[in-house]
């Protein structure tokens, strides 16, 4: 059985078993603490009945006007707990915070273009590709060898006309061409 609760700073001592695959981004401690301090409502942990961390989601709200949105910075589930809808439930919690607490227009996320399993999961949840970011997962913004990302979006209730999910006029963009906010 899995339960969900707010992520705490002590979870940073346990998350190594969750961040084990090459598709999961692992950030520095200060990055996680910054998110926990600024957007605690967007940081949720899943745990087993014996208290082991099985997954987490972290995100934030950003943008202004019609670009005000929730952003999924990371969602990951430890390999033994995958295919149990934990990631879906974590995503639903982030979407609920985005709608009920922030009243934002949409939720967005970036996913490796090669991560077909994650892309299918997001599509089943109502996310669609907004644009492709060329070389997003490189060592730096000027690295031509980086892997592409799909910027996927899902409109929230506030976006009654679904304008936020209409594909970008220029679908393929370099990281420095993106209007972030």
Cite the ranges covered by each PLM segment:
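Short glycine/proline-centered loop/turn elements that form peptide/ligand docking sites
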Residues: 91, 115-118, 135-141
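Loop/turn elements at beta-strand to alpha-helix junctions within RNA-recognition modules
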Residues: 78, 112-115
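Conserved G/P- and acidic residue-centered "switch" motifs that form tight phosphate/ATP-binding loops
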Residues: 85
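Acetyl-CoA-dependent GNAT
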Residues: 2, 9-82, 91-102, 155-163, ...
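Conserved GNAT acetyl-CoA-binding A-motif
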Residues: 98-110, 121
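Structural preference for long, well-ordered alpha-helical segments within the folded cores
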Residues: 89, 93, 120-124
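Conserved catalytic-core motifs of GNAT/GCN5-like acyltransferases
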Residues: 108-110, 123, 128-151
